[in-house]
């Protein structure tokens, strides 16, 4: 009798994706983040579902409903903080996952990479809309500032903003639709993740050397299932430490004040995981220019396969490119810090230099370093 694992129409899909999947024998812990992202997504959908059972998307009661969840619902505070800090873990894993792809040349699988970039945009949109839902001061003003950026689009801008708002300001209609989309998008993301994996399994995984590993593959289970479980335990530990010891560390104190359209907070800033993009937006004095730079700071990932000039795929054996890669990481950390600072000297000029450096490294310095490495190796 054939094994049900290999014969049942549904089970054999799971088998070929997570059990008998041939995987390179040398992939490091940097390859753990894909599975961690899947766990994060499931955690966010589950905690979000239970939060939605108690949340009301009305401007009069939204803030109080979140307070009610924390005070009166059994373990509601655990749900709320797991969801809020789960988003932070999600973005940590996302940025490390993208960074791994950049370092090891995984972007050469263009279909997988492009779906990944679209997924990144979708997750960012979901997180932004979720931040608006508690209807605190930073929720309201964050929504006002970010949606208002669309008014920079020539001719249709103002109409577009009012269409998104559902009125002449961020109000009840805006909150209701943001809740609807925030609930819907994670399920669309789940479907896109399936497509992401479908494209990945067409080619198989990359590995740290960047050299094809078809002649040296091992089954995913038990080797990488046990490795993924270790990664999961470490991530869950970090998340629980955050949730149970300092749940508000990554949040903004202003969001514990109910939204007040008549009182602007002194420093409007998004959650920490958007600060690098916010710093790039603020570093350009022109509104439309800032919006373009903001979008391009993420969209630039799409053209990275076109900027690959090296004869080698991975950066493992390319010291010049490695230096530039870590300079880019340091630059992004600098931008993240600047995004949280007020708009005054010297932060403005530091932000502008860091923004120019960000685009320069990706578009100019990295391709040139790759060509130099080819030349040094007489290729």
From Swiss-Prot:
The organism's place on the tree of life at top rank: Eukaryota
Localization annotation: Mitochondrion inner membrane
Keyword Iron in annotation: yes
GO biological process: mitochondrial electron transport, ubiquinol to cytochrome c
Gene3D superfamilies: Cytochrome Bc1 Complex, Chain C (1.20.810.10)
Manner of cofactor binding, per the entry note: Binds 2 heme b groups non-covalently.
PANTHER family according to UniProt: CYTOCHROME B
Subunit structure: The cytochrome bc1 complex contains 11 subunits: 3 respiratory subunits (MT-CYB, CYC1 and UQCRFS1), 2 core proteins (UQCRC1 and UQCRC2) and 6 low-molecular weight proteins (UQCRH/QCR6, UQCRB/QCR7, UQCRQ/QCR8, UQCR10/QCR9, UQCR11/QCR10 and a cleavage product of UQCRFS1). This cytochrome bc1 complex then forms a dimer.
Cited function: Component of the ubiquinol-cytochrome c reductase complex (complex III or cytochrome b-c1 complex) that is part of the mitochondrial respiratory chain. The b-c1 complex mediates electron transfer from ubiquinol to cytochrome c. Contributes to the generation of a proton gradient across the mitochondrial membrane that is then used for ATP synthesis.
Protein name, UniProt field: Cytochrome b
Lineage: Eukaryota, Metazoa, Chordata, Craniata, Vertebrata
Gene name as annotated: MT-CYB
